Amino acid sequence: LLKEIIDKEEPKIIILLGEARSYSLLSFEVIAINELSNKADNSGFIPKTNKIIEKGPDGIFATLNYQLFEETFNKTKTKFKRSYSAGTYVCNSLMYQTLNYLKAANKTTECGFIHLPDLNKQSLSEIVNGLNEYILSLIDNN
C-alpha cells in the first residue's frame, strides 16, 4: 500500500512516525537495519525469518535532513536525541522497507523515521511544536 501511495503521490518528503514507549525523548532514527525480531506484533504475527528483505543491504540510512532537524528542534527548545537503532520491530521494518523501495525505484524522496516517546515523559505540545516547525522548515527548503 505504501509503495502505491508513493508512486501515485510522488512525495518529496516522507516522515514516518512511531511510538517507542521506553523512550523519554523524541528520537530521529539515523539508520534502519535488515533485521527482524522474533516477537509477535500487535496482530500476533511472528516473522519466520530474521531478514526483512532476504538479499537486501544490511542497513539503509535515513535521507531526511538531520541538520535541519537539529537546528529546528534546538530553535524551538524541543528536546530530542539522535538514535542509531530503530530497533528490530515494526518501526524499523517500515523504515527499512520504505527506504529500500525509494532507493530501488531511484526516487529522490527524502525519508526518515521519528520515534515518539511515552507522553508521560515528554509533553505532546512540545513534540507537536517541534514537528510542526521541522515540517515547515523542510517545505521551505524543498
Predicted features, each with a name:
Residues 1-86, 99-108, 129-142:
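N-terminal catalytic or cofactor-binding beta/alpha core of small enzyme domains
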Residues 27, 94-95, 125-126:
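A short secondary-structure junction signal
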Residues 87-91:
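Polyanion-binding loop/helix "lid" in catalytic or ligand-binding cores
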Residues 92, 96-100:
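Short, hydrophobic/amphipathic alpha-helical patches that form generic packing surfaces
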Residues 113-125:
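A structured phosphate/pyrophosphate-recognition subdomain
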